[in-house]
Swiss-Prot record:
Biological classification of the source: Bacteria, Pseudomonadati, Pseudomonadota, Gammaproteobacteria, Legionellales
Protein name: 4-hydroxy-tetrahydrodipicolinate synthase
Active site: Y132, K160
Function: Catalyzes the condensation of (S)-aspartate-beta-semialdehyde [(S)-ASA] and pyruvate to 4-hydroxy-tetrahydrodipicolinate (HTPA).
Site-annotated residues for Part of a proton relay during catalysis: T43, Y106
Pathway(s): Amino-acid biosynthesis; L-lysine biosynthesis via DAP pathway; (S)-tetrahydrodipicolinate from L-aspartate: step 3/4
GO cellular component, one term: cytosol
Binding annotation for pyruvate: T44, I202
E.C. number(s) listed in UniProt: 4.3.3.7
Organism: Legionella pneumophila subsp. pneumophila (strain Philadelphia 1 / ATCC 33152 / DSM 7513)
InterPro entries linked to this entry: Aldolase_TIM, DapA, DapA-like, Schiff_base-form_aldolases_AS, Schiff_base-form_aldolases_CS
Pfam families given in the database record: DHDPS (PF00701)
Alphabetical keyword list: Amino-acid biosynthesis, Cytoplasm, Diaminopimelate biosynthesis, Lyase, Lysine biosynthesis, Schiff base
């Protein structure tokens, strides 16, 4: 249903409010660069510090600006199942093509709790759902066996798996037997995952190197292994520097350098440490992004 380079959009801020003007411009930027789909109000979009109404504003703005030219996937993760259902229903009413739902953070549910959380959501909304496993940020790891159980639910259609572990991809593909699409959630290993059967990548790097990420995914889908890996090698210094501090700190700094957004973050996120400025600027210049 969704494939290729799927950007995890940042949320531009101005005076501690959502910068709708620059958010609309980002949608146009990605469509022009060939990005295949957009994620609104996800982790990279600072969803953890957005209010409920701000999340809806971001989702609605991206959907309206995209005008059906590319699919829009709404980040609707909430820790409480009932709250997640409510937000997902609202995103569906705005016209989101799917919902990306991260595992609950901090509360550390059991595997059965995860199964019940997602199955209740899926039964309550008529929209495709993409699971999202990122244990490095949530302290919650959804195991492949749980994914396989959830894959039997008709509107659970994919998983963003951010561990970057090739064995995890192989386990999910084997257990789910094609009943669910897998998306890389780790830019550093995305090319290898694409060539091993992942459907796409939900990418931080695509915020900056949109055209190259889209090309890398196109080459992978065309089974051009050499071409795909060549672009991945070219992008590796950027991938690494975009995670020298917590996402989206580095990517917002880079986008500010590129003139795409103002670069403002919401506390407790802070600006990129000065010690990383020179290296990231050099990589952006090497890639002819500034």
């Amino acid at each position: 249903m969704f494939s290729g380079s799927i950007v995890a959009l940042v949320t531009p801020m101005r005076n501690d409010s959502v910068d709708v003007h620059h958010l609309r411009e980002l949608v146009e930027f990605h469509i022009a660069k060939g990005t295949h789909a957009l994620v609104a109000a996800g982790t990279t979009g600072e969803a953890g510090t957005l209010s409920h109404s701000e999340k809806l504003l971001v989702i609605k703005t991206v959907i309206e600006q995209a005008k059906e030219r590319v699919p829009v996937i709404a980040g609707t993760a909430m820790n409480a199942t009932k709250d997640c259902i409510e937000l997902t229903q609202q995103a569906m009413e705005y016209g989101a093509h799917a919902a990306l739902i991260m595992t609950p953070a901090y509360i550390k549910p059991t595997q059965e709790g995860l199964y019940l959380h997602y199955s209740h959501i899926a039964q309550s909304v008529a929209i495709p759902i993409i699971l999202y496993n990122v244990p490095g940020r949530t302290a919650c790891d959804m195991l492949p066996e749980t994914v396989a159980r959830l894959a039997k639910i008709s509107n659970i259609i994919g998983i963003k798996e951010a561990t970057g572990q090739m064995t995890r991809l192989q386990q999910i593909l084997r257990l789910c037997e094609g009943s669910i699409d897998v998306y890389s959630g780790d830019d550093l290993t995305a090319a290898q995952w694409l060539l091993a059967g992942a459907k796409g990548v939900i990418s931080v790097t695509a915020n900056v190197a949109a055209k190259l990420m889209a090309k890398m995914c196109d080459l992978a889908m065309d089974d051009d292994q050499a071409g795909c890996l060549r672009i991945q090698e070219q992008l590796m210094p950027l991938h690494e520097l975009l995670f020298v501090e917590s996402n989206p700190i580095p990517v917002k700094w880079a986008m500010n350098k590129m003139g795409l957004i103002g670069g403002e973050l919401r506390l407790p996120m802070t600006e990129l440490s000065e010690k990383h400025h020179q290296a990231l600027e050099k990589v952006l210049k090497n890639l002819e992004l500034i």
